UniProtKB/Swiss-Prot annotation:
GO terms for biological process: glutamyl-tRNA aminoacylation. The gene is gltX. Zn(2+) binds at residues 98, 100, 125, 127. Keywords: Aminoacyl-tRNA synthetase, ATP-binding, Cytoplasm, Ligase, Metal-binding, Nucleotide-binding, Protein biosynthesis, Zinc. It holds the Pfam family Anticodon_2. ATP binds at residue 240. InterPro entries: aa-tRNA-synth_I_cd-bd (IPR045462), aa-tRNA-synth_I_codon-bd_sub2 (IPR020751), aa-tRNA-synth_I_CS (IPR001412), aa_tRNA-synth_I_cd-bd_sf (IPR008925), Glu-tRNA-ligase_bac/mito (IPR004527), Glu/Gln-tRNA-synth (IPR000924), Glu/Gln-tRNA-synth_Ib_cat-dom (IPR020058), GluQ/Sye (IPR049940). GO terms for cellular component: cytosol. This is Glutamate--tRNA ligase. The keyword rRNA-binding does not apply. It comes from Shigella boydii serotype 4 (strain Sb227). A motif ('HIGH' region) lies at residues 9-19. Binds 1 zinc ion per subunit. Its EC number is 6.1.1.17. Catalyzes the attachment of glutamate to tRNA(Glu) in a two-step reaction: glutamate is first activated by ATP to form Glu-AMP and then transferred to the acceptor end of tRNA(Glu).
Length: 471
């Protein structure tokens, strides 16, 4: 049997982390078994579904490289198929037309609730033989079995059973002729030959209804697995107040897709005590029986730690391709300065996100208007004039410009003046970067370049001279 899974989001918003994890688990299960992964857009909610949301879902899937083998299929383009199946069910007697008014159904609901009963349709039209005009408004309901129970072996939670007496005669076609969500899902899974349905636990109550419809259609019933929800680190359901919840927001905030995927796969699944997984390892090791039944807590600090790991572990050239987008957001012209791959090597240890890296690198490419106020007050004082003049001259004398020679020039200045490296290094750092913090000074000066470094040292000396004149 060929394994076939699907990810079926509703395009009413962005791709959130819960949906992304579900997509990842479905994708991994298919890849682990050499199967196929289908993308289906469940856009039957015409009022809330938007083209922008569809694009956002696609963007998120593509950014995470969760490529699909079939699709995307759109439910709104399959209405003829759904209605043909409903008409067939009406002929076979597994569905019936219901003419009950909204007022009657509301009164029935209130009566049942007053008695402490679970609100459900009473089956009046199921057993009615009244004649109705062809154009009289009606819905179509599924004739759910009235006896027995539905049992399915959830691959994460174990056997789950529902009594058919608890289940309603589900509406499968509305008065406007449009099919309903639960019915469309069933026909899609049948037509697309889905073997395994991996989805959120909020769909557990839909499962017995869908199984009964599949059986009425004499269609194969897929295997089901329901993934637990994701909570914030405070134990409450994940929401915007816990931080970013959109996949593309994490891209915007400077996370690598590898970091988010690694974090999401471990958010409810484990393989021993291993924390870091390549995509190939995820595919190799992923099984549904290793997915936890318990809710997972989203920990942004852990994600940040993983992101920092991947910034330094992945090839700098690859990280640079993702950094480029953030550089563009900051409007930094990188034509005159180090290659982005070299920048990744320079700033990787200091920066935990690519956004932070982009915001920290401007001085490598563009001159700054002024020195940081605290840094200049502390380090660009008259006592720094001589160290800056000496180190400037030594840097200017270097014929070959590797970082090692820059280091020798700084060390030689400290030795000549008989001062500690900090007495030379800190004024030099502020002079060439405009700030009090940077990567190692020798590689920083090397990356900025000889000409630009000397120009900035002269600018710092002019600032010190002006400061002396004001005293």
């Amino acid at each position: 049997m060929k394994i076939k899974t699907r990810f079926a989001p509703s395009p009413t918003g962005y791709l959130h982390v819960g949906g992304a994890r579900t997509a990842l688990y479905s994708w991994l299960f298919a890849r682990n078994h050499g199967g196929e992964f289908v993308l289906r857009i469940e856009d039957t909610d015409l009022e809330r579904s938007t083209p922008e949301a569809i694009e956002a879902i696609m963007d998120g899937m593509n950014w995470l490289s969760l490529e699909w083998d079939e699709g995307p299929y759109y439910q709104t383009k399959r209405f003829d198929r759904y209605n043909a199946v409903i008409d067939q069910m009406l002929e076979e007697g597994t569905a019936y037309k219901c003419y009950c008014s909204k007022e009657r159904l509301e009164a029935l609901r209130e009566e049942q609730m007053a008695k402490g009963e679970k609100p459900r349709y009473d089956g009046r039209c199921r057993h009615s033989h009244e004649h109705h005009a062809d154009d009289e408004p009606c819905v179509v309901r599924f004739a759910n079995p009235q006896e027995g129970s539905v049992v399915f072996d959830d691959q994460i939670r174990g056997p789950i059973e529902f009594s058919n007496q608890e289940l309603d005669d589900l509406i499968i076609r509305r008065t406007d002729g449009s099919p309903t969500y639960n019915f469309c899902v069933v026909v899609d899974d049948w037509d697309m030959e889905i073997t395994h349905v991996i989805r959120g636990e909020d769909h557990i109550n839909n499962t017995p209804r869908q199984i009964n419809i599949l059986k009425a259609l004499k269609a194969p019933v897929p295997v089901y697995a329901h993934v637990s929800m994701i909570n914030g680190d405070d134990g409450k359901k994940l929401s915007k107040r816990h931080g970013a919840v959109s996949v593309m927001q994490y891209r915007d905030d400077g996370y690598l897709p590898e970091a988010l995927l690694n974090y999401l796969v471990r958010l409810g699944w484990s393989h021993g005590d291993q924390e870091i997984f390549t995509r190939e390892e995820m595919i190799k090791y992923f099984t549904l029986n290793a997915v936890s039944k318990s809710a997972s807590a989203f920990n942004t600090d852990k994600l940040l730690w993983l992101n920092h790991h991947y910034i330094n572990a992945l090839p700098p050239e690859y990280v640079a391709t993702h950094l480029q987008w953030h550089i563009e957001q900051e409007n930094i012209d990188t034509r005159n300065g180090p290659q982005l791959a070299d920048l990744v090597k320079l700033l990787g240890e200091r920066c935990k996100t690519l956004k932070e890296m982009a915001q920290s690198c401007r001085y490598f490419y563009e001159d700054f208007a002024e020195f940081d106020a605290d840094a200049r007050k502390k380090h660009l004082r008259p006592v720094a004039r001589q160290p800056l003049e000496v180190v400037r001259d030594k840097l200017a004398a270097i014929t070959d410009w590797p970082a090692e020679n820059v280091h020798h020039a700084i060390q030689a200045t400290a030795d000549e003046l008989e001062v500690g490296m900090g007495k030379v290094g800190m004024p030099l750092r502020v002079a060439v970067t405009g700030a009090g913090q940077s990567p190692a000074l020798d590689v920083t000066v090397h990356a900025i370049g000889r000409t630009r470094s000397i120009e900035r040292i002269n600018k710092a000396l002019a600032f010190i001279a002006e400061r002396e004149n004001q005293q």
